[in-house]
């Protein structure tokens, strides 16, 4: 048996302990306290370890280590600063005999998709991956539309798309304790096998002339006028015109850029993939069973998510998660796991001793208001979770990056072909998106604020009212929201519906959210309206004019048009 520490199902920066059984022996959870459970699992795993995708191999210490990182994040005490970027201006860094890549992608688990798209368009691309470039056992949950983005950019064929789907299920539930329960179809209803998906993309990438460097981490990046030089931890040096940082929230480059910033919000997640669920044909997108819960010296609202797993008809993944700020007395992952063992059985209608734990999952997901992260250096661009492109109320990762693959692949090709690789031009690929920034009010509304004392049922009531109104307004309102797409007209309809149907609840919302955050949200909501008008009324008349411009101007205007489209949510088409 091997104990693997891997990133979580939807996010390559969340550490997950996977107990991979290679024998017929079954291990059941019988202890109430998670530390005893984890120690039992680790003891059974022994010292035999194996790398299992991004994140590599480790031990039970990963839980303690991640909790220590969470403590440092809350207290803002750490001794580890990001690696120093050396921005030395030399006219001739490149030698004629040097091998120069068009792009080096750091972080292959999610970076392989963009790397393959660029390689298929004739770019010379290398992938640097700290561990083996292979997918993990745990599925990624996505909608079919999101997965089809890989076909759209040429990374997968239609047949390959069907082959990487491990499980498909319907319908999915949204429900809140004592309130609304809504059922929807075809949202996050696919479980995709990362093993098959990464293997397929890796093969296509290599076939297109790509280079993969596995078992190597990034040690330092030096930026020059004519190239960026990546120094790997084994001493290997790569010279490239562009560096794509797809190393997620744990990226040392992001750590340097955000040094000294406390996260504006954090999602803590614990869960398991287990065997023994008889009723296993539907999923939960978001569900609550309890009011606000006291956890140590803090309070929090627990949410649930559950999906059938592709490893067997009785296998099911359940997550318990919460939204918090990064103040010192917030609960640890260990404390949450203690609650998970008590709360999961009644949530799923099972007895803990009747299920076999296959994998234990845990992680934290920091988010920042200043997102997406604009390019801070010439020739370096953050992509995916590293850029903060994910919604503050989502898990990020695979589903978050697929939505932007078409935009990013075409934009990066324009930048490379026109040699527009300075930070000002690269920043246009991570533009301000008002629909993303506006989601912060939802994240705050779903968090328990320590400086106010609302009713323990407030968050459940708020969400129940929201989804009750969305259900009445129909699919054009509820479906985009459940896929992290915020659009002006659906949101305006929702707000009007709440004010008309539940006017007495408005003062409670204002108390929970606060005046300044509400004022900030209003600014983004107005921008969302403006972006919607610009995309619908102005953009169509500009398309032919943009094509007549010089390439450098085309690049700028194409990025502006994309910002209007994606920033207004009109990249979503159902």
Where in the sequence are the language-model features?
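Glycine-rich FAD pyrophosphate-binding loop
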Residues: 104, 108, 117-138
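C-terminal helical "tail/cap" subdomain of flavin- and related membrane-associated enzymes
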Residues: 47, 56, 60, 72-75, ...
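FAD/FMN-dependent oxidoreductases across multiple families
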Residues: 310-312, 325-444
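Extreme N-terminal leader/targeting segments of oxidoreductases
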Residues: 5, 9-102, 121, 561-574
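Short beta-strand to alpha-helix junction loop
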Residues: 140-141, 182-204, 252, 269, ...
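N-terminal Rossmann-fold NAD(P) dinucleotide-binding loop
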Residues: 111-112
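Predominantly flavin-linked oxidoreductase catalytic cores and closely associated redox partners
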Residues: 207-346, 405
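N-terminal FAD cofactor-binding segment of flavoenzymes
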Residues: 132-173
